[in-house]
């Protein structure tokens, strides 16, 4: 789950570090965890092996939001609907430039951002976004 862009958790969620099973964090866990929460907290989570409850995961920044278990399906649908309303090309470019920014300098990332920005201004979605803003209505993006 650490590799997900957004993580919604129910208040019944928990995580047990892999060290409790005699293995290392797999699926990029050893690469991601220190980048997400810092070296010392990552060592605490990965090495002490304490079970983390939903509120612990939220406090550490490993999940975006915790909702009551009975509200989880509705909250998940709302997030999906909110994401679906966004401009898909801009969503892809945002994710790409944010990921690049993790491993590049500020100047290199700024170059990538401006290239993406320029490319997006030539799309139908950009024109739709501007028109919707001017007309004070919700945009209807097509991913073009």
What are these model-derived regions, one by one?
Residues 85, 105-106:
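Helical "substrate-binding/catalytic lid" subdomain
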Residues 45-46, 97, 101, 116-121:
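Helix-loop "lid/cap" segments that line or gate small-molecule binding pockets
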Residues 2-91, 122-123, 128-131, 137, ...:
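Crotonase-fold acyl-CoA enzyme core
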């Amino acid at each position: 789950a650490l590799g997900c862009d957004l993580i919604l958790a129910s208040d019944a969620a928990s995580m047990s570090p892999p060290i409790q099973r005699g293995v290392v964090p797999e699926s990029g866990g050893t690469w991601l965890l220190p980048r997400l929460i810092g070296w010392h907290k990552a060592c605490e989570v990965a090495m002490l092996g304490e079970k983390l409850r939903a509120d612990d995961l939220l406090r550490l920044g490993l999940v975006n939001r915790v909702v009551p278990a009975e509200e989880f399906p509705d909250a998940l649908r709302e997030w999906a609907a909110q994401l679906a309303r966004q401009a898909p090309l801009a969503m892809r470019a945002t994710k790409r430039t944010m990921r690049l920014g993790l491993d590049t300098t500020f100047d290199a990332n700024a170059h990538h951002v401006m290239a993406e920005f320029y490319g997006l201004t030539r799309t139908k979605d950009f024109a739709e976004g501007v028109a919707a803003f001017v007309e004070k209505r919700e945009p209807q993006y097509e991913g073009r």
